[in-house]
């Protein structure tokens, strides 16, 4: 699992990017966010995740919000 911070997330469109120190930003789709209820992320929020190869390159999977 990697750790990063949410760079930005558009809850209307359901996607955004996660910043990872020393690496390129990683695309995140709302469907990759773990948990119940409305799936969104806040700018600057700490998250842990895995990287998988998507249709358009690397993207986040199994995203969990850090306490």
From Swiss-Prot:
Pfam assignment, any one: CSD
Span of domain CSD: 4-63
Induction per the UniProt record: In response to low temperature.
InterPro entries given in the database record: Cold_shock_CspA (IPR012156), Cold_shock_domain (IPR050181), CSD (IPR011129), CSD_CS (IPR019844), CSP_DNA-bd (IPR002059), NA-bd_OB-fold (IPR012340)
GO (cellular component) term, any one: nucleoid
Principal place of residence: cytoplasm
Gene Ontology terms for molecular function: DNA binding; nucleic acid binding
Loss of function: phenotype: A double cshB-cspB disruption mutant cannot be made.
BP GO annotations: regulation of gene expression
The keyword Ion transport belongs to this UniProt entry's keyword annotation: no
Disulfide bond sites: none
Localisation: Cytoplasm, Nucleoid
PROSITE patterns linked: CSD_1, CSD_2
Keywords in alphabetical order: Activator, Cytoplasm, DNA-binding, Stress response, Transcription, Transcription regulation
Entry's transmembrane regions: none
Biological function: Binds to the pentamer sequences ATTGG and CCAAT with highest affinity in single-stranded DNA, and also to other sequences. Has greater affinity for ATTGG than CCAAT. Can act as transcriptional activator of cold shock genes by recognizing putative ATTGG-box elements present in promoter regions of genes induced under cold shock conditions.
Quaternary structure and partners: Homodimer. Interacts with RNA helicase CshB when cells are transcriptionally active.
Protein name: Cold shock protein CspB
Lineage, top ranks: Bacteria, Bacillati, Bacillota, Bacilli, Bacillales
